[in-house]
């Protein structure tokens, strides 16, 4: 599959946290994705950008928290995360750039 410019708009960045590292043992990787992206679009983007076969895509939307900034309340943006499970034998090195 060839890489298209819109694939770079779907995947914002990889998420590297303790929880994301734990699920990577099960051949799953976590990415922050655009809010309007669908599961088929996420699957196509990951397969094209990283040259792997995707088994499943699960998504969650984390609501933004209310935080104080300079004494005034503000709201952080909502974040959509995609948990991408790969077929056996495939892997992604998220430490390297696209």
UniProtKB/Swiss-Prot annotation:
Species assigned in the record: Paracoccus denitrificans (strain Pd 1222)
InterPro entries in alphabetical order: Nucleotide-bd_a/b_plait_sf (IPR012677), Ribosomal_uL23-like (IPR013025), Ribosomal_uL23/eL15/eS24_sf (IPR012678)
Function of the protein: One of the early assembly proteins it binds 23S rRNA. One of the proteins that surrounds the polypeptide exit tunnel on the outside of the ribosome. Forms the main docking site for trigger factor binding to the ribosome.
Single GO term (MF): rRNA binding
GO process annotations (BP): translation
Assembly and oligomerization: Part of the 50S ribosomal subunit. Contacts protein L29, and trigger factor when it is bound to the ribosome.
Family named by the database record: Belongs to the universal ribosomal protein uL23 family.
Domain of life: Bacteria
TM annotation in the entry: none
Name the UniProt record assigns to this protein: Large ribosomal subunit protein uL23
Any matching Pfam family: Ribosomal_L23
Gene Ontology CC: one annotated term: ribosome
Keyword field: Ribonucleoprotein, Ribosomal protein, RNA-binding, rRNA-binding
């Amino acid at each position: 599959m060839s890489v298209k410019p819109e694939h770079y708009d779907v995947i914002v960045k990889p998420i590297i946290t303790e929880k994301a590292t734990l699920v990577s043992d099960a051949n799953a990787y976590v990415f922050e994705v655009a809010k309007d992206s669908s599961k088929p679009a996420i699957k196509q983007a990951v397969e094209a950008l990283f040259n792997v076969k995707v088994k499943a895509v699960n998504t969650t939307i984390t609501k933004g928290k209310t935080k104080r900034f300079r004494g005034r309340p503000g709201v952080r943006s909502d974040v959509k995360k995609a948990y991408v499970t790969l077929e056996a034998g495939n892997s992604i090195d998220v430490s390297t750039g696209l």
